[in-house]
Amino acid sequence: MVPSHLRHRPPTFAMQASVMLLAAGRSTRLGALGLTLPKPLVPICGHPAITFGLRAAAQAGASRAVVNVFHRGDLVRATLGARASGLAVDYAVEADLLGTGGGVANARALLGPGPALVMNAKVVADLDLPALLAEHAAHGATATMLLRDDPDPQRWGAIGVDATGRVVSILDARSPHPPEGAVTLRMFTGVQVLAPALMDRLQPIFCDLIRDAYVPALRDGETIRAATLGGYFAEHSTPERYLAGNLALLRDPGLLRDPPGTLAGVDPEARVAAGARLIAPVRIAAGAEVESGAEVGPDAVVDAGARVVAGARVRRAVVWSGATATGDVSDAVVTASGVVMVNAEAA
């Protein structure tokens, strides 16, 4: 719970932390999709996934972010450039993949001496970052983890939280301090605030932020706090989760308080022929083309530079930039390299 005197502070207070988005993973679980685009750039209703986190940080008062890159790092840098979503962007380039822990350590010079707000670039969530930072500051914690309820937190690596909001267990590690009240198991969202003391445990070699920093800090009795995310959350590590994330926001754009752009509807700059049929909800981006005789929707996203030809039927699908949809396309992602079928029930 954030104390009342810390709520609604101006952005200059809220962002007394540097910002980092973790964007260097290999994207292997995305399969063929990850060969075309790295996870930070997969489009969610037409916007690269990483821009959702950047936008949230900008709205919280940040002016700059650090992004680490490895897999397809050149493409990430070319897409975001020196500014993205209202933030100046600096890049921590990894010659070898360093993992979540090594990635943070490698970026320390760019992050500066204070605390760091670190987010996973594949995550899209309804974030209240000022509240998270206020919670961290109120308790002087070594780290503050943004957690959420999940029916099966064990599959993500459960985090145990006591009645006061203190983290008492991470994976199989336990705090030496007994919990106060009941312990609830929750899922870690990949959004966190790290004090310098926690980052000092990391080296710029391949290592894991949880296992190589959080776990030893917890076992040493350091204070790790938990904040709770009550709103929308999605991560896009697999084709199934990727498609589900697109469709969730397409159906209900109001799940996010401040997305990086429009999530549903037809952009005025889209080229939709008079003889095309659109069945809501759809997102037809600027520069997308839907030919006469094509049917798009329900539940379809056509990205900028994508094309749906005459006679095609697209539903429960995303058509990426540079791709052409033909025939009957459903439960799929269409890329310039081909169609990736998605098992929607596996999401």
PLM region descriptions:
Residues 260-347:
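Structural signal for interior beta-strand "rungs" in well-ordered beta-sheet cores
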Residues 115-117, 124, 130-137, 150-153, ...:
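Catalytic-core segments of class I nucleotidyltransferases/pyrophosphorylases
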Residues 66-69, 146-147, 318:
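Short internal beta-strands
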Residues 76-163, 203:
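Conserved beta-loop-beta/alpha segment of the NTase-like Rossmann-fold superfamily
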Residues 11-77:
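N-terminal glycine-rich phosphate-binding loop and ensuing alpha1 helix
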Residues 5-8:
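Intrinsic-disorder-associated, low-complexity terminal segments enriched in Asp/Asn/His/Tyr and depleted
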Residues 41, 159-161, 214, 226:
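A structural signal for short hydrophobic beta-strand segments in well-ordered beta-sheet cores
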Residues 51, 101, 105, 282, ...:
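Glycine-rich phosphate-binding loop at the start of an alpha helix
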